């Protein structure tokens, strides 16, 4: 610590010291000590941002790497994370927002929900931190209302096709198909392998893995345009072009026993990995669920035109106590945070175009290249949502075990579809 001192010529300084020494000896031993000048440094206030998202387990571990990177860059900001299901938030948030309150500063939620809350005036506009030109085309559509961006895109899961173990294919001299006929022939060949219960394991929970398989067939043989028209209700499920996809492509595979009956999806991962099944349709997050992701290969349906790219969206409620810092975090998550996230075992894809293939975790690089060469499409049942989504799941579970009831399934999907 420095003391305040005037600049005194050397000779005068020496003289002053001599006089001071003599004086101190003559004055009854009394010593006067100056108090040094202390400069007080203002400590920067540390604030806490609360973040709500859907992740837990290994997925949360990957996301926490992103949050830790933000905290490292912003030592004055600490982050608290809580896990909530979107289904629960859809009930909790509207009530809190109406009371001008929020449980967190940054919240991950469905795109359609964010748009709805934005229209009601509960969210901050993000146009100043999000440049649409920097993102995958169309990725902001679901969170933009009248030109106002209410949701920021994070990374996305893709639902790109059927996964297989490279070691399994090498052991049985199997090759990925190039045509639809090749695909059917491959299933028949796999079915004959001793110990195989079915060529394809059918993951299930509430029904969504089956919906992902179905949408992959629609996108391959009907394209993105048909998927969008089904979402909007502009094309019926009993329409000939939709029925044809079921009758000529999906249902024959079900009847031939190429798909297993629905099995709880995480258990299905283990059974497939052990070799009881050869193929498994699942999202890219499966790369973080297996022992050796480098043993994974991917087979999209031959001729696929588009794939479901399902981004995670985040919003900043108007009722945050720290709007500046919350927007700073939102911008980070939508940009450089994506670069960090795709480098983890998250199994996610970037929606920010400034992320390169080299930024990806190695087992995801080939997947990223495949997805880059097709159109991105929204998830059908998530886009429609509501009670119809549950009907869709239930009807597909019925179709999987009783494919002869296709007419009944398609009719029910039309009857239960939300009316405009």
Curated annotation (Swiss-Prot):
Tell me the residues on which N-acetylcysteine occurs.
26
**Coiled-coil portions:** none
What single Pfam family name could you report for this chain, choosing any that match?
SBP_bac_1
Lipidation sites of kind S-archaeol cysteine? Answer: 26
**What PROSITE patterns does UniProt report for this protein, alphabetically?**
PROKAR_LIPOPROTEIN
Keywords of this entry: Acetylation, Cell membrane, Lipoprotein, Membrane, Signal, Transport
Localisation per UniProt entry: Cell membrane
Q: Has UniProt tagged this entry with the keyword Signal?
A: yes
Signal peptide region = 1-25
* GO CC, alphabetical: plasma membrane
Q: How does it sit in the membrane?
A: Lipid-anchor
**Tell me, what does this protein do in biology?**
Probably part of a binding-protein-dependent transport system PH1036/38/39.
What family does this belong to?
Belongs to the bacterial solute-binding protein 1 family.
Name this protein carries in UniProt: Uncharacterized ABC transporter extracellular-binding protein PH1039
